[in-house]
C-alpha cells in the first residue's frame, strides 16, 4: 500500500471539492494512506472521515502557498504525489526533480479557455505553455472526458475517469411535495455557465407561472454577483440563494426540485462534454433543461429525461422552461432519467481505473 499526498489547487473545503473527496475515499478504502494538502484560510490540521487534511494559510506574499505546500510534500515521505489542476502541476516539476517519486496529474477542467474567461489572454497563453512543459514530466494524466483526454494524450499516458456522482451521496429519496414548481441550479455562477441568461429566462417565465428558483453555488465575479442580486431585487424574483453547499449535503436540495438547469454557453469545449451536474440531476430523478451539444443531446434523448435548448437565447430558454412545466409527463421524465443513469453514470462503476493507476506506479 502507498503513502499518497493529494495536492489541491484551491481550497478543498469551501467550496467542497467533490472530485478530490471521491478519489481520496476510493484510495482510502483500497488501503492506501492518504493526506490532503490544501490552501486554506488558516494553517491547521483537520480530519475528514479518518483522512488527515493539512491546511496551509493563503495569507502572505505571492508564492507563499506554493512554498508551504511544496515544503510539506518534500518532508512527508510520500510514495506518490497526486496533483489536482494547474498550480500543483507546476509544483510537480519541483517534486519530481527532487524526489524522483511518481506524479499523477488530475485535470478536471479545460484550463486554457477557463483561464481566458476568468483572467484574460495572457494567463491563458502562459497556462498553455506550462501544460505543454509540465504534463510531459508526470507519470500519468487523469482527466474527466474523452475530448480533454485526446487533447492531453499527446503529452503522456491518459486515463479518462468521468466525474460521475456517487450513489452513496445521491441515494434515491422520496420526492418532496411542492406547493409550486421549483427550478434548481447547482454549481459555479459565471456568464459562460449561463448565470445571466438563466435569470433573464426565469424572469420571463415567472410572469406566466407561479414558480421558484433555487441556486446552490457561488460567484467568481463580484460584478456579476452584484448584477444578479440587483436583477433579482428589481424584478421581485425572490430567488433562494443558498451559496456553496457541501457536496454531501445536496441530496435533500435535489429532492425539492422540479427541473434542473444547466445552461452552458455556446463554446466548443462544451460540445463534446457533459457537465457533472446533469448526471446529478438525472440520478436524483430531476428532469433536465440543458444547453445543446452533441453528446448531451444524445444523452437526453436516450434517457428521455428533459429538453435541450439554445442556451445563449434567454427567450428560447424561457420557452424550454415553459415546455417542461406544461408537460404532463414531467415526473415520468425524472423516473426515466434516474433509472437510466443509475445503471451507467455513477462513480462506483469507474473508480477501479484510479486504483489500477496507483498500483502500476508503486
What are the functions of these language-model segments?
Residues 302-303, 307-314, 323-328:
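Conserved acidic donor-binding segment of nucleotide-sugar-dependent glycosyltransferases
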Residues 25, 67-75, 90, 94-98, ...:
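Membrane-proximal helix-turn-helix segments that form the acceptor-binding/catalytic region
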